[in-house]
């Protein structure tokens, strides 16, 4: 800042260069590694109709050869647009849950896991936004990365 000794540094995760840029990929990296380690062939996750987390999950699963099933809060629109369109283009299977029924979406996720298992698949469940003890490692890694950046740039 002009005339000040204060420095403001910004880590621009959205500029990492792909359609899955941004902070969502940090947590997803660890969640999907866990899914692969467990031998899963399908990933189930949930979010809103325009969820960035769901978009990233669908695209990365497509690249990894994993099936993805999204549970989305909202009614199916006539024409998908935005992230929802990208979900479809990435090959996601989508179940829509009306907002008034959203409280039961965790039960639906468990039912889907059982359905996939009965069909011979193994499904890994990622909570909304990969906000769990596995996804947390993405931000632990980010803080280590920032420390290295500070050391290098100071």
Model-derived features with residue positions:
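PLP-dependent amino-acid enzyme catalytic core
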Residues: 1-154
